[in-house]
Regions:
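Sec-dependent bacterial lipoprotein signal peptides
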Residues: 1-19
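Predominantly soluble domains enriched in secretory-pathway, periplasmic, or organellar proteins
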Residues: 18-371
Length: 371
């Protein structure tokens, strides 16, 4: 089964007149797996408005499911998990946002199947591919042309059904959330790896209980001190300190007060603002995005509230992914279900201002924004 990809929520600050906004346009890329397409939009830096580029969407690989952009802004990668593909597409990003595919596509076969999720280290040296059909992770080094070469001993075995993965900001550790019911407990777990030249080595101990069922959402704060886990079926958020004092590097230790009961239902995707001050939670069951402030000392989230209720912003459908634009000025929510599309918000100190919703023809599975 292909896993739902986390798409994106764009955090937005300074909406009124967009004070302090960059005047540079960014380009937004959305995968549409049912149509095997990649949609491309220009983001207006002052309003957050998205305008689809003429001649797009592009027809690309079978089941195109996850997209990631190189930190240089030069290259874009798409995972194609369909039975006719099992590969990664590479594109040059042109100055006007258009794409030029660079053949041939890079296969994850024969030892990898259904490459459903991509992640890249902050330096842009390695691409990590989560293969949900073979329960492993393929790792590729990236050369100066964007080309991919599989590192020695790749793919790296997980052995459990993976749901999501996240790298620390340093790129030294990678964590994979896995479904429960496989190791004698209904709770999901977090599998930890140290990273050296792209190669993965299991931490000791390798598994940490997520203390919740179906840990779909993962996010790490900008300092690399805390990891937040959305436990969809348990309606909770678990918080872990990363490498706390007197523990081996990479150790996860649940903080006091975790897990935190989510005030809404079915939390699926998480996003932290660039400063790590606010946590955004996409709740599929209640079709909204809740906002929490983060205690910088303990890492614990606290729901923001009005005089009568908690902050929650209604989405047009079932929100499945969140991503911010590079300037932290806009937040975009990927909605699935009968109202599939991309919903834009402006952000100001955690407050979300609904802007526009964009119908994309097919359900989006992921989004990336060029820096």
């Amino acid at each position: 089964m292909l896993q739902k990809a986390l798409i994106l929520v764009f955090a937005v600050a300074g909406i009124a007149g967009c004070v302090g906004c960059s005047t540079t346009s960014h380009y937004v890329y959305a995968t549409l797996p049912a149509a095997n397409e990649l949609a491309v939009y220009r983001e207006d830096p002052f309003s957050g408005t998205l305008t689809e580029l003429a001649g797009t969407p592009y027809t690309i690989g079978d089941g195109a499911h996850s997209v990631v952009i190189h930190p240089s802004g030069k290259f874009l990668y798409v995972a194609n998990p369909g039975q006719n593909e099992n590969d990664i597409s590479l594109f040059d990003i042109l100055s006007n946002g258009y794409l030029n595919e660079i053949p041939p596509r890079t296969t994850v076969a024969p030892n990898g199947t259904q490459p459903a999720l991509l992640a890249m280290d902050p330096a842009g040296n390695y691409l990590y591919v989560m293969n949900t059909g073979s329960d492993n992770i393929s790792v590729f080094s990236i050369d100066s042309t964007g080309g991919l070469t599989q590192v020695p001993n790749s793919p790296f075995f997980i052995g459990l059904t993976p749901l999501n993965m996240v790298l620390t900001p340093s790129g030294d550790f990678l964590y994979v959330s896995v479904a429960g019911g496989q190791i004698g407990t209904s709770n999901g777990s977090i599998l930890g790896f140290s990273v050296s030249s792209g190669a993965l080595q299991l931490l000791n101990p390798p598994l940490t209980s997520a203390d919740g069922v179906n840990p779909n959402g993962l996010v790490i704060d900008p300092s690399g001190s805390y990891m937040y886990v959305a436990n969809t079926q348990s309606d909770s958020i678990s918080i872990f300190a990363i490498s706390p004092p007197n523990t081996p590097p990479g150790t996860l230790q649940q903080v006091i007060g975790s897990p935190l009961d989510d005030i809404y239902s079915d939390p699926f995707a998480l996003l932290l603002d660039p400063k790590g001050q606010f946590l955004y939670v996409a709740n599929q069951g209640s079709s909204n995005v809740a906002v929490y402030s983060i205690d910088s000392t303990t890492g614990l989230p606290t729901a923001l509230t009005t005089s009568t209720s908690a902050f929650a912003f209604t989405t047009e459908g079932s929100p499945s992914f969140l991503v911010e634009d590079p300037n932290g000025n806009y937040l975009f929510v990927g909605n699935q279900g009968s109202s599939a599309g991309i919903q834009a918000f402006g952000v100001n100190s955690g407050n979300l201002n609904p802007l526009l919703t964009y119908a994309v023809g097919n359900t989006p599975s992921s989004i990336a924004v060029a820096p």
